[in-house]
Regions:
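Type III/flagellar secretion export determinants
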Residues: 1-258
Length: 258
C-alpha cells in the first residue's frame, strides 16, 4: 500500500485530473446531472428540503451530508440568512452552515436564490472536491485530512476556527506533535499555543502551506503506518522534490521513539 505522504502527493500534484476522475464516476455523473437539471426549479426553502435527492447533494457539497436528516435545523438556518450578524447560521461555531446558507440565500434573494452560479456549478465543484476527499479517506484517512486542510487553510483567520473544526484540529495537533489529551485543556490555552507555533498567514503562501501539509502527512504515517518504517524512510529519501530534508527525517525518527 502507498503511504500517506506519497498518496497525498499523487492526488494534489494534479488536482484537476484527480477531480476529472471523480466527475466521470457513474454515480457522480447521475447525481450531478439530476442536481443541475433541477436546482433552478427550486423557488423556496420548502421546495429545497422537500427534494431529498437534491438537498442531500447540496449538503454533501458543503461537507454536511451527515446532517441531511436534520431538515428542521437547516430550515431554521436558511430562514435566518447571513445578513444579520446575530442570525442562527452566523452564531454557529461551525462555518460550514454559514457557507451553506450563503450559497442558498433564500432569505436575501427569495425565489431567485438558486439562479446564482454558486448554487449551480459552484455547488457541483464543491461536491466533486468533497467526493474526492471522501474517496481518498476510504483508503487513508490521513490523505483525506490533508486534502481538506489544503482546501480550508487559506481562509483560517484564528486558532479558534481550527479548534472548532475536528478535521483542521486533527491536522494541526498532528503536525505540531500535540497529544490528543491536549484537547481537554482550556480552549484559550489551546488557541494560544497554536497561534504561538503557527503563523496563519503562512497558509496563504502555497509553498509554506505545502511544507506544513508535508509535515502532517509524514507524521501521520509514522503514527498510523500503512507501510513499514524502513519503507517509509526509503520512499521519502527518493522523493527530494517534495522538500523533506534529511534533518527533518532524522528529527521525525527520533520523535517516534517517544
Amino acid at each position: 500500500m502507498i503511504n500517506t505522504y506519497v498518496s497525498y502527493q499523487l492526488i494534489a500534484k494534479d488536482i484537476g485530473k484527480s477531480l476529472d476522475r471523480v466527475q466521470n464516476q457513474p454515480v457522480v455523473e447521475r447525481e450531478t446531472e439530476y442536481y443541475l437539471e433541477n436546482i433552478t426549479k427550486v423557488k423556496s426553502i420548502k421546495e429545497f428540503v422537500a427534494d431529498d435527492r437534491l438537498f442531500r447533494y447540496a449538503m454533501k457539497a458543503h461537507g454536511l451530508e451527515d446532517m441531511a436528516y436534520a431538515k428542521a435545523f437547516m430550515v431554521k438556518a436558511l430562514e435566518g440568512g447571513v445578513e444579520d450578524k446575530d442570525s442562527f447560521a452566523n452564531k454557529l461555531s461551525d462555518k460550514r452552515y454559514k457557507e451553506f446558507v450563503n450559497t442558498f440565500n433564500f432569505e436575501a434573494y427569495g425565489d431567485t436564490a438558486t439562479l446564482f452560479t454558486k448554487a449551480q456549478q459552484g455547488t457541483v465543484d464543491k461536491y466533486l472536491r468533497q467526493t474526492l476527499e471522501e474517496n481518498a479517506g476510504d483508503q487513508n484517512e490521513g490523505v483525506r485530512l490533508a486534502l481538506y486542510f489544503e482546501r480550508k487553510a487559506s481562509s483560517i483567520t484564528n486558532a479558534y476556527e481550527i479548534l472548532a473544526d475536528p478535521a483542521l484540529k486533527q491536522v494541526a495537533f498532528t503536525a505540531l506533535g500535540l497529544p490528543d489529551s491536549f484537547g481537554n485543556a482550556d480552549i484559550d490555552k489551546q488557541a494560544k499555543l497554536i497561534e504561538e507555533r503557527i503563523d496563519l498567514e503562512d497558509f496563504k503562501d502555497p509553498e509554506l502551506l505545502s511544507k506544513f501539509i508535508n509535515r502532517f502527512t509524514t507524521l501521520w504515517e509514522i503514527n498510523n503506518p500503512t507501510v513499514s518504517a524502513a519503507s517509509l524512510v526509503t520512499t521519502l529519501f527518493t522523493q527530494p522534490e517534495y522538500g523533506i530534508s534529511t534533518n527533518l527525517l532524522l528529527t521525525m525518527q527520533s520523535m517516534k521513539a517517544y
